[in-house]
A protein has these predicted regions:
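N-terminal first-folded block
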Residues: 2-36
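An amphipathic, aromatic/His-enriched active-site/gating alpha helix that lines ligand/cofactor pockets
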Residues: 24-36, 55-89
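Residues at the start of alpha-helices and the adjacent loop-to-helix junctions
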Residues: 17, 44-46, 70
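Non-catalytic surface loops within mature trypsin-like serine protease
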Residues: 10-12, 58, 92-95
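Short, well-ordered beta-strand segments in beta-rich or mixed alpha/beta enzyme
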Residues: 2-9, 39-66
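Glycine-rich beta-strand-turn "strand-cap" elements at beta-sheet edges
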Residues: 2, 39-46, 76-99
């Protein structure tokens, strides 16, 4: 299971535009093979920082989405709203012995 976290700092006056892009894309992302969950989180302060959190069956499923036509359409629109490059992490549960 891959837990994908993406941090996006959006232009303050474009937050509503970004939220609309996410809402229009959410169900299409969930329909992708291997996607179990996707949600948008907003920082309390400063409130122009957002995080997307998604769960993927495998890294291959995530990468297939990132290579998809849909991602190729949505990402440029999102990228145009950023104040700086997005940061992203693909993580998985660490089965450390102390857990």
């Amino acid at each position: 299971m891959i837990k994908r976290i993406v941090k996006l700092e959006i232009q303050a006056d474009k937050a509503a535009d970004f939220q609309n892009i996410f809402e229009e894309s959410k169900m299409k992302i969930l329909a992708r093979e291997g996607c179990f969950h996707v949600e948008l989180l907003r920082c309390v302060s400063p409130d122009n920082i957002f995080f997307t959190f998604s769960l993927w069956e495998t890294e291959d499923a995530l990468n297939a989405y990132r290579r998809s036509e849909m991602f190729g359409q949505v990402w440029p629109m999102t990228k145009a709203l950023l104040t700086k490059p997005a940061e992203a992490w693909s993580t998985q549960l660490d089965n450390a012995p102390w857990q």
